[in-house]
């Protein structure tokens, strides 16, 4: 072997030995570091620990000093703050950066109160979900949630709208930072969303004549507020306006505690009508509204649902039919029954009467046979006691002939002439498909608030016809004592009534519109409301209208007439 090859073999052998020695020393060093690592970790207080095969479970748990690092509450993981956790922080006196941000949010000046409208249904404008709905206080739109991937979070990042209000908890939040905003300057927004009234405020409603100023500068009287006509719901608007000015009914629904604990069967949707009506009453009488009108959207949606689409927003309806259904549905939803259990509805509007009925022989029969039939028990007069929510007043038939100017003659009739139906003497014939009856009526109990429904529409086989007869009625001092039976007249100390609401139907039966005249008790003035339009009106002008529904208030002993004419 040459000298050169010997040198190369010795060099390769030496290199192998050095690499092996370096590898073994590296392994030894790594093993030493691995043994030292748990000791160093425990000395630093790190949560990292080595899991050993024979270590007991209690020894493997994190030490007490590690707990704050292990249990970290992240805002994007939890949608709602924990109240107990907030209380603990307050007791310990630890105010973190989140609390400081809550008190000093830099985005409060971006809130635009002029676009806020809480009258519509509380659902997300994207997902159409009612769950966890938030209102953007910059643009007024509704969004769901406030988590990392929620519609409200995406909206805040995309459009730089940062202040949101939870429509259910009434809490304010800043997104996307996701912290609660606590500021007293936002109380006016929560009051518009959910107005509240104390007993003292409710008692003074009819004594105040002070105008309120909306956010846009317009002035209005609480309670005399226009209702938005979404499409063809003016018939419902007029009825709701009239009922909102009946003090006992209004006072009952202004205080939510009066009805929120009423128990209803599971799945009962009728109680939704009570809740929505209460919300509408509080909005109509809110002295701190942002605008001088209210939209009855949520109320009407409850009407459509509970009436099974008998009454709709997009189709004109009959005011009397709606009033009759609404009062009975409200009575039933409040837990009332037909005979025994009473509610605020029956306490305010329900009266009673006697109905005398006598069957008539068929008109085509011979006179002798008629005489014989009249002696049978079937043709004897019977009497039943019945309750009523309103009285239907029949108008005389309108003339068919025109005057010398080729115009239809519009007749006039006094109110007391059509009230004679209930004096217990006047008989009227009622026809059915096979039989004819004579009926007369006599009142036995007068309610605190009496509703008159003037029958203007008659249906035949082809169309609905409207009677344009003008009813001449006084605004005050209508005494109904003569329409009571003699034995109950002594029980009724007060039988004098004053008008407080007058609903008018204008135009054709299918294409007409509704408006209402309302008395404001605080000022003693009359106002005309037609959808969003509110104007004052002289009492003398009210009697010239085609009255359709009227609400009269029974006068008390200590009450004086303040209505003027």
Swiss-Prot record:
What are the record keywords, sorted? Cell cycle, Cell division, Hydrolase, Isopeptide bond, Metal-binding, mRNA processing, mRNA splicing, Nucleus, Phosphoprotein, Spliceosome, Ubl conjugation, Ubl conjugation pathway, Zinc, Zinc-finger
Spans annotated as Disordered = 1-61, 75-95
Q: What is its EC number?
A: 3.4.19.12
In the record, what terms sit under GO molecular function?
A: hydrolase activity; zinc ion binding
What chemistry does it catalyse, as a reaction equation?
Thiol-dependent hydrolysis of ester, thioester, amide, peptide and isopeptide bonds formed by the C-terminal Gly of ubiquitin (a 76-residue protein attached to proteins as an intracellular targeting signal)
Q: Which residues form the USP domain?
A: 225-555
Q: Which CDD domains match?
A: Peptidase_C19M (cd02669)
Tell me which domain of life the UniProt entry assigns to the organism this sequence originates from: Eukaryota
Which residues are recorded as binding Zn(2+)?
A: 136, 139, 155, 161
Q: Where are the zinc fingers (UBP-type)?
A: 103-200
- The question of whether Cell division is a record keyword is answered with yes
Q: Which residues carry this modification: Phosphoserine?
A: 46, 82
Q: Where is the composition biased (Basic and acidic residues)?
A: 1-21, 28-39, 85-95
Question: By its UniProt entry, which SUPFAM superfamilies does this protein fall under?
Answer: Cysteine proteinases, RING/U-box
Major location, coarse class? nucleus
GO BP annotations of the record are: cell division; mRNA processing; mRNA splicing, via spliceosome; protein deubiquitination; RNA splicing; spliceosomal complex assembly
Q: Which family does it belong to?
A: Belongs to the peptidase C19 family.
Please give the subunit comment from the record: The U4/U6-U5 tri-snRNP complex is a building block of the precatalytic spliceosome (spliceosome B complex). Component of the U4/U6-U5 tri-snRNP complex composed of the U4, U6 and U5 snRNAs and at least PRPF3, PRPF4, PRPF6, PRPF8, PRPF31, SNRNP200, TXNL4A, SNRNP40, SNRPB, SNRPD1, SNRPD2, SNRPD3, SNRPE, SNRPF, SNRPG, DDX23, CD2BP2, PPIH, SNU13, EFTUD2, SART1 and USP39, plus LSM2, LSM3, LSM4, LSM5, LSM6, LSM7 and LSM8.
> What role does this protein play?
Deubiquitinating enzyme that plays a role in many cellular processes including cellular antiviral response, epithelial morphogenesis, DNA repair or B-cell development. Plays a role in pre-mRNA splicing as a component of the U4/U6-U5 tri-snRNP, one of the building blocks of the precatalytic spliceosome. Specifically regulates immunoglobulin gene rearrangement in a spliceosome-dependent manner, which involves modulating chromatin interactions at the Igh locus and therefore plays an essential role in B-cell development.
Its recorded name reads: Ubiquitin carboxyl-terminal hydrolase 39
Say which species the protein is native to: Homo sapiens
The gene from which this protein is expressed is: USP39
């Amino acid at each position: 072997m040459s000298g050169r090859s010997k040198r190369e073999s010795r060099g390769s052998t030496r290199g192998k030995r050095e690499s092996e020695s370096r590898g073994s020393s590296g392994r030894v060093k790594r093993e030493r570091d691995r043994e030292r690592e748990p000791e160093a970790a425990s000395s630093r207080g790190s949560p990292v620990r080595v899991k050993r095969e024979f270590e007991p479970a209690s020894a493997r748990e994190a030490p007490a000093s590690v707990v704050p690092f292990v249990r970290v509450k992240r805002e994007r993981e939890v949608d709602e703050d924990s109240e107990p956790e907030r209380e603990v922080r307050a007791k310990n006196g630890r105010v973190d950066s989140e609390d400081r941000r809550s008190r000093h949010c830099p985005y409060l000046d971006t809130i635009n109160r002029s676009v806020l409208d809480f009258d519509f249904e509380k659902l997300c404008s994207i997902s159409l979900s009612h769950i966890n709905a938030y209102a953007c206080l910059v643009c007024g739109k509704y969004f769901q949630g406030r988590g990392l991937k929620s519609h409200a979070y995406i909206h805040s990042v995309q459009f730089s709208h940062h202040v949101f209000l939870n429509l259910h908890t009434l809490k304010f939040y800043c997104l996307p930072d996701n912290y609660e905003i606590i500021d007293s300057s936002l109380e006016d927004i929560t009051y518009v969303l959910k107005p509240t009234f104390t007993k003292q405020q409710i008692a003074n409603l009819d004594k105040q004549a002070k105008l309120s100023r909306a956010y846009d500068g317009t002035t209005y009287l609480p309670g005399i507020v226009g209702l938005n006509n979404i499409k063809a719901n003016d018939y419902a608007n007029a009825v709701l306006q009239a009922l909102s000015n009946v003090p006992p009914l209004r006072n009952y629904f202004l205080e939510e505690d009066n009805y929120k604990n009423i128990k209803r069967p599971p799945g009962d949707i009728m109680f939704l009508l009570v809740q929505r009506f209460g919300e509408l009453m509080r909005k109509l009488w809110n002295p701190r509204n942002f605008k001088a009108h209210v939209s009855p959207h949520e109320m009407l949606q409850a009407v459509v649902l509970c009436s099974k689409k008998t009454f709709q927003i997009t189709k004109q309806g009959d005011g009397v039919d709606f009033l009759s259904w609404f009062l009975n549905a409200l009575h039933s939803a409040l837990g009332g029954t037909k005979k025994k259990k009473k509610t605020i509805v029956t306490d305010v509007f329900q009266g009673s009467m006697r109905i005398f009925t006598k069957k008539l022989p068929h008109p085509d029969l011979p006179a002798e046979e008629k005489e014989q039939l009249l002696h049978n028990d079937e043709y004897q007069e019977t009497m039943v006691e019945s309750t009523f929510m309103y009285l239907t007043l029949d108008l005389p038939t309108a003339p068919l002939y025109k005057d010398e100017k080729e115009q239809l003659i519009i007749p006039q009739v006094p109110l007391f002439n059509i009230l004679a139906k209930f004096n217990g003497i006047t008989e009227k014939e009622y026809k059915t498909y096979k039989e004819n009856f004579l009926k007369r009526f006599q009142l036995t109990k007068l309610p605190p608030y009496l509703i008159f429904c003037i029958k203007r529409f008659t249906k035949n086989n082809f169309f609905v016809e409207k009677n344009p007869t003008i009813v001449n009625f006084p605004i005050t001092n209508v005494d109904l004592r003569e329409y009571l039976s003699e034995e109950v007249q002594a029980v009724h100390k007060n039988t004098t009534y004053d008008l407080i609401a007058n609903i008018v139907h204008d135009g054709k039966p299918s294409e007409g519109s509704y408006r209402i005249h309302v008395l404001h008790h605080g000022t003693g003035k009359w106002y005309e409301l037609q959808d969003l339009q509110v104007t004052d009106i002289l009492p003398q002008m009210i009697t010239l209208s085609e009255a359709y529904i009227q609400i009269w208030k029974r006068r008390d002993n200590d009450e004086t007439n303040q209505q003027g004419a």
